[in-house]
């Protein structure tokens, strides 16, 4: 994917699957974009996903808090805002497996709650 390439139809399908697994759409788009490049900047993610800067920033904060993404400062000549490059810390397949494990845990909790609820009906 070049810096300005938009997400493909296949990418959008992956985004929808991630949303179905519980991620927000912005988080899913950002994650898919990151998975297609070894390293990228926020501006490149904005162009590829159609998200606005604040949306990408919030998604990156969440991905970094999950330890799925690392940030690297890029040296820039002159003044202005610093530029950061981002990359996934895990293969996308491991992130997907983490989401699957989390979903299974949630299902177990819901099933246990429903089982306990039946005792009161």
Question: Predicted segments — roles?
Answer:
Residues 16-26, 41, 72-96:
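Short, cationic-aromatic polyanion-contact patches
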Residues 29-33:
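Pre-recognition alpha-helix immediately N-terminal to the DNA-recognition helix
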Residues 44-48, 63:
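A short acidic, leucine-rich amphipathic alpha-helix
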Residues 67:
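Glycine-centered, phosphate/nucleic-acid-interacting loop/turn motifs that mediate DNA/RNA or nucleotide
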Residues 28, 54-55:
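Key DNA-contact positions within bacterial/archaeal DNA-binding proteins
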Residues 90-121:
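Amphipathic alpha-helical dimerization/coiled-coil segments
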Residues 3-20:
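Short, Lys/Arg-enriched N-terminal segment that forms or immediately precedes the first helix
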